[in-house]
């Protein structure tokens, strides 16, 4: 078979005609050294601080240190495949993440890549991970309640939409349990809201430096209860590199801000910020930034303040949305005066202290009501809750003070004895099993029973049984009363008080 010269020339002409002239221009640099998740790169002269750069094999990094002769880049992934002399490209974009409704029900990493095996995330909207917090003018003071479903929190340490409330305690004191119960509690409210977005609350949970098994367990619980439908889980686990653990809270806040900025309401839980500070310290020391107190860098306060300031209640002109934050901090041996705990306490609008001592006494949630405080206070409570919850905090404070003295004296006068009896029953009443949040109306009725003397004749050991029976009685025979408290939100006096008293008297007659 002969070679067809005409055919070959035709093919060559065709190839030459269609030859693409467009050349891709990319600013590149070369890796000088790499190790411990940090790369030193030479040649990226115009790179911006916080810009995403790309290594061979699609591995991404972020430029953090801009020095005279090189750029310090933190690597979002394994640095094993990166070697000296590799080419690094600028992407010309600051680190951003996907946002939008498509993320609801998903588990993603700190860059928004899915981890749950449910396919890609169908959204075109993206947002920069580290954006500026809203200014003073767009904000409005916090006034709507954000119900946690926990009696001790909703009654004594109320949280409002747009507030930042710190959950602080040693390891194994139930910090995550409080946060998880808050997410589960929103299911009833979200289901009842229907299409009314102003009543719904979307939840974002950020796991920083936790075990993968712990995160998997949490996701399983959310799926079982159906709470995953209105939740996003962002996971940067203990096995992820430090830069991912540093970035995850910022990325998750951008996902939550999507709801805030569209006139909706969101809740974000950072579990926990101590581990984020540790990973930031690791990165800073490896980048040779000067260390400060406890070897943390000088800007570790700013690390947390710029993150938590993004949670806000926006005013009418800006869509009325809100973002509530529940940051979690783990203390060592109950030391709340360490560097990171004091920093975050000063940034937030209050804190819930959880104590090991109370936890082992069986008081769970182990909230120390004396040290816990909400700086928004009763402006974030419903009228009904406000009118019954006032006396509880005072009575428990008096009880704690008296209980300390009562250990020394045996002959106590009747008033002191009454105070101790009431306090013991209220303490018992504040206990609550995990995964069983209560509605606002149920908490109002239970606390009313506690403060108005309905428990005074009941042995302390039977308080839990009384409460269980009372809730079953209210849900079965007095659903109308619970609906009335929920919808009308009356002050508990006059007619409303009579209705609750009638229901409690009816139950008292059957309880034995």
UniProtKB/Swiss-Prot annotation:
It is an enzyme of class 7 (translocase). InterPro entries: ATP_synth_asu-like_sf (IPR023366), ATP_synth_asu_C (IPR000793), ATP_synth_asu_C_sf (IPR038376), ATP_synth_F1_a_nt-bd_dom (IPR033732), ATP_synth_F1_asu (IPR005294), ATPase_a/bsu_AS (IPR020003), ATPase_F1/V1/A1_a/bsu_N (IPR004100), ATPase_F1/V1/A1_a/bsu_N_sf (IPR036121). The keyword Lyase does not apply. It is found in: Cell inner membrane. GO terms for cellular component: plasma membrane; proton-transporting ATP synthase complex. Keywords: ATP synthesis, ATP-binding, Cell inner membrane, Cell membrane, CF(1), Hydrogen ion transport, Ion transport, Membrane, Nucleotide-binding, Translocase, Transport. It catalyses: ATP + H2O + 4 H(+)(in) = ADP + phosphate + 5 H(+)(out). Its main location: membrane. ATP binds at residues 169-176. The keyword Membrane applies. One of its GO terms (molecular function) is ADP binding. Pfam families: ATP-synt_ab (PF00006), ATP-synt_ab_C (PF00306), ATP-synt_ab_N (PF02874). The record marks 372 as: Required for activity. It is a peripheral membrane protein. Its EC number is 7.1.2.2. NCBIfam families: atpA, PRK13343.1. F-type ATPases have 2 components, CF(1) - the catalytic core - and CF(0) - the membrane proton channel. CF(1) has five subunits: alpha(3), beta(3), gamma(1), delta(1), epsilon(1). CF(0) has four main subunits: a(1), b(1), b'(1) and c(9-12). Produces ATP from ADP in the presence of a proton gradient across the membrane. The alpha chain is a regulatory subunit. Belongs to the ATPase alpha/beta chains family. This is ATP synthase subunit alpha 2. It comes from Dinoroseobacter shibae (strain DSM 16493 / NCIMB 14021 / DFL 12). The gene is atpA2.
């Amino acid at each position: 078979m002969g070679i067809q010269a005409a055919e070959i020339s035709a093919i060559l002409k065709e190839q030459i005609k269609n030859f693409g002239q467009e050349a891709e221009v990319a600013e590149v640099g070369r890796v000088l050294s790499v190790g411990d998740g940090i790369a030193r790169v030479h040649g990226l002269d115009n790179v911006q601080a916080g810009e995403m750069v790309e290594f061979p094999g699609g591995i991404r990094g972020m430029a953090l240190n801009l020095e005279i002769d090189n750029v310090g880049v933190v690597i979002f992934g394994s640095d094993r495949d990166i070697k000296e002399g590799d080419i690094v490209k600028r992407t010309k974009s600051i680190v951003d993440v996907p946002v939008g409704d498509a993320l609801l029900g998903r588990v993603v990493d700190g860059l928004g890549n899915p981890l749950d095996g449910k396919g890609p995330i169908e959204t075109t909207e993206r947002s920069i991970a580290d954006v500026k917090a809203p200014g003073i003018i767009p904000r409005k003071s916090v006034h709507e309640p954000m119900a946690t479903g926990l009696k001790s929190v909703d009654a004594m340490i109320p949280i409002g939409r747009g507030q930042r409330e710190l959950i602080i305690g040693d390891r194994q004191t139930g910090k995550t349990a409080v946060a998880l119960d808050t997410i589960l509690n929103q299911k009833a409210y979200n289901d009842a809201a229907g299409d009314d977005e102003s009543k719904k609350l979307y939840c974002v949970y950020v796991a920083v430096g936790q075990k993968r098994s712990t995160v998997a367990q949490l996701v399983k619980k959310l799926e079982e209860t159906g709470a995953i439908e209105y939740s996003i889980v962002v996971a940067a686990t203990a096995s992820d590199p430090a830069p991912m653990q540093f970035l995850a809270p910022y990325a998750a806040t951008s996902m939550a801000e999507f709801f805030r900025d569209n006139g909706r309401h969101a809740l974000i839980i950072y579990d926990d910020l101590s581990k984020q500070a540790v990973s930031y310290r690791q990165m800073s020391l490896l980048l040779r930034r000067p260390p400060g107190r406890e070897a943390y860098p000088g800007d570790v306060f700013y690390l947390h303040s710029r993150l938590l300031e993004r949670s806000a209640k926006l005013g009418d002109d800006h869509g009325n949305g809100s973002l509530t934050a529940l940051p979690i901090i783990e203390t060592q041996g109950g030391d709340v005066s360490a560097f990171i705990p004091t920093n975050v306490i000063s940034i937030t609008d209050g804190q819930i202290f959880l104590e090991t001592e109370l936890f082992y006494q069986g008081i769970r949630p182990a909230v120390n009501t004396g040290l816990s405080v909400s700086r928004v206070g009763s402006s974030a409570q419903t009228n009904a809750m406000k009118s019954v919850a006032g006396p509880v905090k005072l009575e428990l404070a008096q009880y704690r003070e008296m209980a300390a003295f009562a250990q020394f004296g045996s002959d106590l006068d009747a008033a002191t004895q009454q105070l101790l009896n009431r306090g013991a029953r209220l303490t018992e009443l504040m206990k609550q099993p995990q995964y069983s949040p209560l509605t606002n109306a149920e908490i109002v009725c239970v606390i009313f029973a506690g403060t108005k003397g309905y428990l005074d004749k009941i042995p302390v050991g039977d308080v839990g049984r009384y409460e269980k029976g009372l809730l079953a009685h209210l849900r079965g025979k007095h659903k109308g009363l619970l609906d009335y408290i929920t919808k009308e939100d009356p002050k508990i006096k006059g007619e409303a008080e009579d209705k609750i008293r009638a229901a409690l008297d009816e139950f008292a007659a059957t309880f034995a």
